[in-house]
Amino acid sequence: MKQSHFFAHLSRLKLINRWPLMRNVRTENVSEHSLQVAMVAHALAAIKNRKFGGNVNAERIALLAMYHDASEVLTGDLPTPVKYFNSQIAQEYKAIEKIAQQKLVDMVPEELRDIFAPLIDEHAYSDEEKSLVKQADALCAYLKCLEELAAGNNEFLLAKTRLEATLEARRSQEMDYFMEIFVPSFHLSLDEISQDSPL
């Protein structure tokens, strides 16, 4: 039986830091970001289903979000100002991402490939799935900005403003609900969010 390097590669997502051009109070890696995006994407899907008549598979959305940046283990996390410097660079980077996604899929044993390929290849996502994962991705980047700003790091002021515009462009009922119910707590200290806890 042939060995696969697939999970050994994915394990290295924890070595790739996000926001590489920014001074960070706390460094965030791609692995922990992916977990947070999965949790938020799952919540958005659940909110959509429960509150707004949606019919999406929240567990699949969480899985897609877990793998949404998997190709960065081969490409690295390119800083946003570089990635979107102009349309040509953005287009070329998308092509590089596609190649990296295919390379990861090719690492999976053939008998399992049909399970993992639709998780890694974003072209297999439905429009609704892609929208929910992108909303969650932007929300988590926004939450990172709030955390950095709360810690006194003004380096993230412009990023927060840019992400507010992104969130507005991707706005949905489920995102509005999440922003109203869950996001305000990110402005609070540990003591403040623990006041109601019996522990």
Curated annotation (Swiss-Prot):
Name of the gene this protein is made from: yfbR
Binding of substrate, residues: R18, W19, H33, D69, D77, L78, P79, T80, D137
Effect of V30A: Shows reduced activity and affinity compared to the wild-type
Keywords, in A-Z order: Cobalt, Copper, Cytoplasm, Hydrolase, Manganese, Metal-binding, Nucleotide-binding
S-S bonds: none
Swiss-Prot/TrEMBL site (Appears to be important in orienting the phosphate for catalysis) positions: R18
Gene3D superfamilies: Hypothetical protein af1432
Similarity field: Belongs to the 5DNU family.
Database matches in HAMAP family: 5DNU (MF_01100)
pH-related activity note: Optimum pH is 8.0.
Recorded coiled-coil stretches: none
Organism placement in taxonomy: Bacteria, Pseudomonadati, Pseudomonadota, Gammaproteobacteria, Enterobacterales
Cofactor: Co(2+); Mn(2+); Cu(2+)
Keyword Cytoplasm: yes
The protein's name: 5'-deoxynucleotidase YfbR
Organism: Escherichia coli (strain K12)
Activity modulation: Inhibited by both ribo- and deoxyribonucleoside di- and triphosphates.
Reaction equation(s) it catalyzes: a 2'-deoxyribonucleoside 5'-phosphate + H2O = a 2'-deoxyribonucleoside + phosphate; dAMP + H2O = 2'-deoxyadenosine + phosphate; dGMP + H2O = 2'-deoxyguanosine + phosphate; dTMP + H2O = thymidine + phosphate
Pfam families per UniProt: YfbR-like (PF12917)
Binding-site residues for Co(2+), renumbered to this chain: H33, H68, D69, D137
The keyword Nucleotide-binding is assigned to this record: yes
Source superkingdom: Bacteria
Cofactor note: A divalent metal cation. Highest activity with Co(2+), followed by Mn(2+) and Cu(2+).
Effect after changing E122A: Shows reduced activity and affinity compared to the wild-type
General function of this protein: Essential component of the deoxycytidine triphosphate (dCTP) pathway for de novo synthesis of thymidylate. Catalyzes the strictly specific dephosphorylation of 2'-deoxyribonucleoside 5'-monophosphates (dAMP, dGMP, dTMP, dUMP, dIMP and dCMP) and does not dephosphorylate 5'-ribonucleotides or ribonucleoside 3'-monophosphates.
Database matches in PROSITE patterns: HD
